[in-house]
UniProtKB/Swiss-Prot annotation:
Family stated for the protein in its record: Belongs to the RuvA family.
Molecular-function GO terms, alphabetical: ATP binding; four-way junction DNA binding; four-way junction helicase activity
Protein name: Holliday junction branch migration complex subunit RuvA
Biological process, per Gene Ontology: DNA recombination; DNA repair
Species this protein is from: Pseudomonas fluorescens (strain ATCC BAA-477 / NRRL B-23932 / Pf-5)
Domain III: annotated span: 154-202
Cytoplasm recorded as keyword: yes
Subunit details: Homotetramer. Forms an RuvA(8)-RuvB(12)-Holliday junction (HJ) complex. HJ DNA is sandwiched between 2 RuvA tetramers; dsDNA enters through RuvA and exits via RuvB. An RuvB hexamer assembles on each DNA strand where it exits the tetramer. Each RuvB hexamer is contacted by two RuvA subunits (via domain III) on 2 adjacent RuvB subunits; this complex drives branch migration. In the full resolvosome a probable DNA-RuvA(4)-RuvB(12)-RuvC(2) complex forms which resolves the HJ.
Disulfide bonds: none
NCBIfam families, A to Z: ruvA
Domain of life of the source: Bacteria
Amino acid sequence: MIGRLRGTLAEKQPPHLILDVNGLGYEVEVPMTTLYRLPSVGEPLTLHTHLVVREDAQLLYGFASKRERDFFRELIRLNGVGPKLALALMSSLEVDELVRCVQAQDTSALTKVPGVGKKTAERLLVELKDRFKAWEAVPSMFALVPNQPDAPAPVASAESDAVSALISLGYKPQEASKAVSAIKDKGLSSEDMIRRALKGMI
């Protein structure tokens, strides 16, 4: 199991990144909440990781903190929750927000996540309640501290990256395009476009 990687951020292509560790490039998929906290390309980066081995692929998921990684592991233990749905949940809501939903048994925020209907949300909250008794909603301690932002990407590229990232989370292409097109400030980075689009959808 690969539990942590430390190296240099070589590339960002939401929701994936390439982490260069001593010349070896690891492709890592991250939730949007981690993506927002990434440093600039070329800067050092440490990720807490979870490796999924399948017959046809080995998939590496990365998180800004051990707490996020552990939360992801709790989610994928649930019946019917795979890595894709777990990342969609963690991309739409911060860990503390998800914990509060569990504590309050509040389905409203969860049902806005792609792939989560009311019945699924209710089942997830019931299953999570006992597991998360030890999870208090406390201020998150993230390992990543944003450095100076990268130079703004070309508008068309940033919009395209944002749309692709939303589609990867399970949103329909039309929904993703509409959410990104609704953003008035076209000079934003792809990360900021994704953040605003998700806020508009949740």
